[in-house]
Amino acid sequence: MEQKMTNNHITIGILAHVDAGKTTLSEAMLYSTGQIRSLGRVDHQDAYLDNDAQERERGITIFSKQARLDISRGTNAADTARTADVARTADTARTWHVVMLDTPGHVDFSAEMERTLQVLDYAILVISATDGVQGHTRTLWRLLKHYNVPTFIFVNKMDMQGTDAEKVQAEL
C-alpha cells in the first residue's frame, strides 16, 4: 500500500451493475479534470468512452475503455480543469497520472470486466441508490476482494425519486 502512495501513476477501475451510472461518473471525472470539454450522456449516445457503434446503439458499455487523467497535487478539481494544459506539462512529481478504466456493467460482458481487475491499484464500485445492491454487485465485491483491490463505494442516483437511503445503507 505504501508503494502506491509514493508512486504518481495509478490505475483505477470503475465497476458497477448495468445502469448504475458508471459511465456518467466516468464522464464527470473526465470533465472535472479537464480531459473533455463537455459532458456526454449515454442516453444521447455521445458518451466519450462509449464510442463503439454497438455501445451507443444499446446504451451500455461492452468494451473496457481507458482514459488518462492528469491531476495536479494540491489543487481542487475546478483548479485542475482550468489548468489542464499546465497539468499535462507540470513537474511529474506534482502530478498524479491516473489511468481510469471504465468497464462493462452487464453480466454478459463479465469476462471483459474481469480482465481489468488484475491491473487495478484501486476500484470505484458504483451502486445505484434506486436499485440497491444487486447480485452482480455482490459478484464484483467478491472479485475485488479476491484480487485484493482497495475499493471505494460510490452510491449514485441519491437524488432520484423513491430512493431509500437507509435501505441502501443496510444492504451495504
Please provide the spans of the model-predicted regions.
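GTPase G-domain guanine-specificity segment
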Residues: 157-172
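Intrinsically disordered, low-complexity tandem-repeat regions enriched in Proline and Serine
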Residues: 81-86
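Conserved beta-strand/loop subsegment of P-loop NTPase cores
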Residues: 99, 122-126, 147-158
